[in-house]
Amino acid sequence: VGETLKLGISDVTCGTSTPVTGEAMTVTTTLFNSESTDANIKSITYAVGSQVLASATDVGTVPASGTLALSYDVSFDTARVYKVTATVVLEQDGKEYVFTKDITLDVLNADDLVYIGIDASHYNEYVAGNYKDSMGNFGNLAGKYNVRTVELKTSDELIAACSNPKFKTLILTAPSRRLADAQTDPRTYSAQELAAIAAFNAGGGTVILAGWSDNYENYDVIQNNPAIKHMAATQNEVLQALGSSLRIADDATYDDVRSAADGVDKWRLYFNTYGQSFLTDGVEVDPAHPYDRLYTEVFSHYGGASVYAVDADGKPTSTLPATVSPVVYAHSTTYSVDVDKDGLGGANVPKYAYAENDSRLLAMASEQLEGKGLIIVSGAAFMSNFEVQATISDNGSEKNYSNYKICENLLRAINPVKVTDIATVQAQTEAGHKYTIEGVVTSNASGYDKATAFFDCIYVQDETGGINCFPVAGEFKIGDVVRVTGVTETYQGENELQVSSIEKIGETTPVTPKVVTSTQINDGSVLGQLVTLKGFVVGYEMADGLVQT
């Protein structure tokens, strides 16, 4: 038995997390050579099917025991999902070898995109401060909703975004006071920046502010320099400019009881108490297992501060105005700590009534002022990579953090999903086009009743038509109203939607089968719909004891 050839393509990546039409994107192919002699690159080609996107010949050498990355720009004019195949021909020791590797690019329509600006100009934590470059998962999630995240790396970029109609939301995470560079240059918002952000919100833009625990300001360089404005004070200047009654506390949220139960640090908190807010729609809480992540979606709040409200005079108040909606409450055992001993945290931070005789600290809240955009305030960066897991499977058998669902609800509000009628989807003959449909389930999923289900799929129907959706797991049944997102595909002559996401959004009366003729059956005009046909069977074909046609 010979040894395996240690030569080929290790990876193909795209430099753009949200590819869009009409915009060049860089695709990089990394080659590896673990053999003892160099390998010449005879050619490299990028193609979608038979369409060549880019190609080159005699482009270099992959050194022995080394790697080489080759990058090329490609672009697309039509929004759809593309499978791009990289084909590389390598020559080593007089022999040629051909290697291929695919990358799937979900190219969005540039005209449908909206933008979220993420401030990176103030050493913002999780962006350009500590844990920098930790917003990628949120950016990838945003792309699924035709939303692109853009880091605003300078003051000019931040101000420009505030007047750009493509931008619908700004995210301002806490300006670091922990990073060494930030301690030397503790950045705050200029008068011009505050005015621009206020104008953005007044024009309907959503502004999200996140804090961080004053544990990350408990350093001699800060303690010995009263001129350094703390993170909470810096963020609160923005909130004041917006006319908001919400504030971020200069404190840390600790919990002795839950940290002991969970075996974590006192500031590593998992909250499970939610307010009445669209942001928490669909968040799962099992009253019988409120702390068990096998049953409940908890809110991850790491190293965070609390959130409170001020009255008309700017003084802390334990009464929330009608404009404010609590989103996430702390546990009843959670308390405020003044870690940096500046007298601003601790027992004087207001709590808010969650239930009778049960007032709690707030971890997150929103405010809707008349005629303005939404304001969302959190004591920590709830959308960082650590809180927004890329997929549920990242957590094994446990449920995902509710942060993920909160971000989904936020993105839906920023750019509502465009629902396409099923007839339009059926009319699309080219594979790879992404659509979202809503309709009534007309066949049970195997997860609900295997005896009456098709294999790993369901049919969904609206007023214009029906279509097969594959693959589908879960207990979806006849009469459920579902929202399905997927790409067009054809299987044995039948158009279908290759499902990327499906959710139940209601229930209704099951669809009544449409009475049709054999002509309609044969011409495909009712393909995918629930029908009934009257007539006589004159023939059928069997295979493995089952009727095939």
Annotate each predicted stretch with a short phrase.
Residues 59-67, 476:
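Short proline/glycine- and polar residue-rich coil/turn motifs
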Residues 417-549:
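OB-fold single-stranded nucleic acid-binding module
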Residues 70-78:
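Short, hydrophobic beta-strand segments
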Residues 33, 81, 89-418:
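Short, surface-exposed patches at the edges or C-terminal ends of soluble domains, predominantly
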Residues 19-20, 36-41:
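Short acidic/proline- and small/hydrophobic-mixed sequence motifs that coincide with surface turns
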Residues 2-9, 509:
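Proline/serine/threonine-rich low-complexity linkers at boundaries of modular beta-sandwich domains
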Residues 22, 78-82:
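Short tyrosine-centred short linear motifs in exposed loops/low-complexity segments
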Residues 16-23, 63, 428-432, 525-527:
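Short, solvent-exposed loop/linker segments at the N-terminal edge
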